């Protein structure tokens, strides 16, 4: 079958149903009563949201609707100070770059942690890493925005919104985890674009969106090679930190631009 014949109607239908969802369907995700979240976390209500990007990279397609159960997620990336408490309590090895004075400030995100390190911390806290769907919903809210604050950006606002490469955002490397409040997501999360890439729970599959479940998708069930990373970092351009961008690496890899935040599922 001709590829254009298949993809053009699909794009039209994606846009059509997105419009219906936004304009006509109820939005239980914002109307539910909100339980009190644990300190430093934000409640994300259950409900549908549009995931992916119909005009983006191949692994971001198609735009599709996903339903997640309610959960709590960290308002900001795990900081060096928070990770130090984990090290002191468990004897876990210190991260790579722990002695780097440009990266180890207490209120900056911990970096140099592998996916396995991040999972160990999350389990110690009683939670886990977010799935891709949970992460994107927390960053995007209930519409098809490309950044936490919307679909547009102005060259003059980097100082207040996001930590990316080559812009006047006030930091050469990582920024404090509670910085850039103007760039918060619709739910109030900070640094969902830029600062550091964030490990997610899922194995990576470039074609997963084409076959994924509508309800609480969690990546391929079988072990893969790479784990998902989301959000971009201070070494990416503004396009590279869109909330739909997907990256990946092997779960043992540690990098100065890799950090994480945690999720606590609802009982």
Task: Give each language-model segment a name.
Residues 1-10:
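N-terminal secretory signal peptides that target proteins for export/translocation
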Residues 15-24:
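Bacterial N-terminal signal peptides
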Residues 29-33:
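Boundary at the C-terminal end of the N-terminal hydrophobic targeting segment
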Residues 35-95, 113-116, 138, 193-194:
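A short glycine-rich, aromatic-capped structural motif
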Residues 42, 65, 146, 198, ...:
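Residues embedded in well-ordered beta-strands
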Residues 44, 50, 54-55, 93-245:
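Functional-site microenvironments in short loops/helix caps that host divalent-cation chemistry
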Residues 58-63, 217, 246-251:
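Short, P/G- and charge-enriched loop/turn segments at secondary-structure junctions
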Residues 256-267:
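Short, structured beta-strand segments at or near domain termini in extracellular proteins/domains
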